[in-house]
Amino acid sequence: MIRLSAAAALGLAAALAASPALAQTSATAVVKAGDGKDAGAVTVTEAPHGVLLKLELKGLTPGWHAAHFHEKGDCGTPDFKSAGAHVHTAATTVHGLLNPDANDSGDLPNIFAAADGAATAEIYSPLVSLKGAGGRPALLDADGSSIVVHANPDDHKTQPIGGAGARVACGVIK
């Protein structure tokens, strides 16, 4: 009886693990600065209508910084241009959370780094999904995606990137 119960439980666990309903619900990005130094981590958790980000960053210059989802899971170059443009839908969109037209899906609120260079925040984005739920762009698509931190804050209106400046940190979302 005990062997049968253990076998049934093992079979049930295997079936549940393969279930699409229990697909990956969170992902992590290990963030690096352009010089390769550790700059912290970002956890992205699937929510019913978007994603919740938990950012724990370090080594930033004090003050406000833009953060965006970028379309490629590639932080291989020191300037992080390999991460591509912002995540976006198939439709033509423009940059900026304050833009009256549809903004691109990579747009996020600014983050603030304290005097010691640390930035800790939770941000909700209804614009993306880990796997494409609700028709939102998938962060974990075939070429992946990344989170990029910029040198300056985003004004949320100016094209193409809101005056955010250079890319200073990047992490591939996995």
From Swiss-Prot:
Q: What is this protein called?
A: Superoxide dismutase [Cu-Zn]
Q: What does this protein do?
A: Destroys radicals which are normally produced within the cells and which are toxic to biological systems. May function against extracytoplasmic toxic oxygen species.
Write down how the cofactor binds this protein: Binds 1 copper ion per subunit.
> What does the sequence similarity comment in the record state about its family?
Belongs to the Cu-Zn superoxide dismutase family.
Listed PANTHER family: SUPEROXIDE DISMUTASE CU-ZN -RELATED (PTHR10003)
Pfam family membership, one = Sod_Cu
For whether the record's keyword set contains rRNA-binding, the answer is no
Name the catalysed reactions.
2 superoxide + 2 H(+) = H2O2 + O2
Positions of disulphide bridges:
C75-C170
Q: What is the lineage of its organism?
A: Bacteria, Pseudomonadati, Pseudomonadota, Alphaproteobacteria, Caulobacterales
What species is this protein from?
A: Caulobacter vibrioides (strain ATCC 19089 / CIP 103742 / CB 15)
List, alphabetically, the InterPro entries matched.
SOD-like_Cu/Zn_dom_sf, SOD_Cu/Zn_/chaperone, SOD_Cu/Zn_BS, SOD_Cu_Zn_dom
Q: How does it assemble?
A: Homodimer.
Q: Which residues bind Zn(2+)?
A: H86, H95, D104, D107
List ligand-binding residues for Cu cation.
H68, H70, H86, H150
Q: What is its EC number?
A: 1.15.1.1
Q: Name one molecular function that GO assigns to this entry.
A: superoxide dismutase activity
